[in-house]
Amino acid sequence: LRKNMRPEERRLWYDFLKDYPVRFLRQKVIDGYIVDFYCASAKIAIELDGSQHYTQAGVEYDEERDRLLQAWGIEVIRFPNDVLRDKFEETCRYIDQIVTSKIKSTNRK
């Protein structure tokens, strides 16, 4: 686990997820993998991707990791760091829409 959040993680956490009405956790370990943010009630993992995620090794690692998380029923949502920086409000609205939709569909079951 990292003690210090990257600037994009810090902004998403302190400016949106920390006080979001549905609980999110930071740096959640799931089956040996650490996700940036996790919402158990919506079964969503949010990942903020820096440049290392776009190398061949990074892409392969992320694909393997996403498959494992999906096997647990967790939807992985990825945002490139630059999208979070450039379109923060839109990113937050998108996260809200997904969480709301997932919780509604879970409650209907």
List where the protein language model places each region.
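Nucleic-acid endo/exonuclease domains
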Residues: 1-109
